[in-house]
Structures are given as C-alpha cells and as structure tokens.
Design a protein with these regions (language model features):
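Sec-dependent N-terminal signal peptides
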Residues: 6-13
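An acidic-aromatic pocket/loop used at catalytic or ligand-binding sites
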Residues: 2-6, 21-134
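C-terminal motif of bacterial Sec signal peptides marking the signal peptidase cleavage site
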Residues: 17-19
Length: 134
C-alpha cells in the first residue's frame, strides 16, 4: 500500500473515530426523509433492503460507525422525537443491544443499535403506507 493510501486511510479512520453522535443529522433516504441519521455513520448498502409496492414502502437500512452506543441511542431518540416520531418503547440488553420502537401517523419505525468488534451498528426498519391517488 502506498504512503498516500495509508495516509488517506488514517484520515478517514480518525474522522470517523472523532465523529460526534450529537452532530446535526442528515436524511436517511429520500423515501424516509423524516428519519434522521447522526453524522459519523456510513450506509451499508449490501446489508440494507428497500421494498416498494403501490400500497407500501418498507426499508431495512443499516449504518455503521465508531460512536459510543449510549450517546448514539440518545441522539437517535432526540432527533426522531424532534421529527414528530413518538417513542413507543425502548429496551436494552447486554446480548442484543438497544431496541427503540417509534410511530408517527400510522407509520412504524424500529431502531436497533448494537456493538460489533470494531463498529457500532444501527439498523432502521421502517414502513409506511403509500398515498394512493384518487
């Protein structure tokens, strides 16, 4: 690996390691713009799925980053509630991490947060009914 590739890798890792969970959020996907994702998380396209039909849109969106899980869970709750989502329940276990469940105008959202060996993962599972034109 060349010096510049190593240097680039170090810069990327350092920026991810110093990312703050309370940084301004960015939208997840255009279909789910009211579900913010804190900066410092990278979208994992190969682990994610988006399903669209005439009646429903659903998604399983996976992100990862190097953010402390407790501050990430708090940031997720704060930003989601700021976007009108109502927290229905929240559970934390040592084995399975944190699960947060939200609802908003008949739409549902489940947030799973867990720690892997190197990264903290966030899985957003959302569904919403499509507005049918008449």
């Amino acid at each position: 690996m060349s010096f510049f590739h190593r240097l680039s890798a170090v810069v990327v890792i350092a920026s991810l390691a110093t990312a703050c969970a309370s940084a301004p959020p960015r939208p997840v996907r255009s279909e789910f713009e009211d579900i913010p994702v804190p900066k410092g998380l990278t979208y994992e396209a190969d682990r994610s799925t988006i399903i669209e039909s005439p009646q429903v849109k659903a998604a399983r969106l996976v992100y990862r980053g190097r953010i402390e899980i407790e501050s990430l869970a708090a940031a997720m709750r704060t930003t989601l509630e700021g976007n009108g989502w109502r927290n229905v329940s929240s559970t934390t276990t040592a084995r399975h991490g944190t699960t947060q469940v939200y609802e908003k105008a008949g739409n549902s959202l489940q947030v799973l947060l867990w720690e892997g060996l190197w990264y903290t993962y966030v899985e957003l599972t959302a569904s919403r009914a499509s507005q049918l034109s008449r």
